[in-house]
A protein has these predicted regions:
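Alpha-helical substrate-recognition element adjacent to the catalytic core
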Residues: 1-71
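Short acidic, Pro/Gly- and aromatic-enriched capping/linker segments at domain boundaries
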Residues: 65-84
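Asp-based, Mg2+/Mn2+-dependent phosphohydrolase catalytic module
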Residues: 82, 87-93
Length: 93
């Protein structure tokens, strides 16, 4: 399974790590799932987010890019990140 997860408001909420979500994502990775950090951040702000995640014990498999399996399945690399599950604070409720 491929899981795409946002950073601001999702993995980090008001400067605090969402430990419960981070733990669940680590469990998913141990099961063999792929986790993509899917964020609008770039440059220094993206580097800060990655450092924040590392300090909180999490490293995504990919950052703002499709995984090779998805690229092969889609026969190309579209701009939209392909995932089976999207986790984002802005999702419809």
């Amino acid at each position: 399974m491929i899981i795409a997860v946002d950073f601001d408001g999702t993995l980090q909420i008001n400067g605090t790590a969402n430990i419960g979500l981070i733990q669940r994502l680590r469990q998913a990775q141990r099961r063999g799932d792929t986790v993509i950090l899917w964020t609008c951040r770039e440059g220094n702000r993206l580097a800060e987010a990655l450092l924040f995640l590392q300090r909180n014990g999490f490293r995504p498999n990919y950052v703002n890019s499709n995984c090779p399996d998805a690229i092969a399945r889609l026969k190309g690399d579209p701009r939209k990140i392909f995932a089976d599950v999207y986790i984002d604070d802005k999702s419809a409720k």
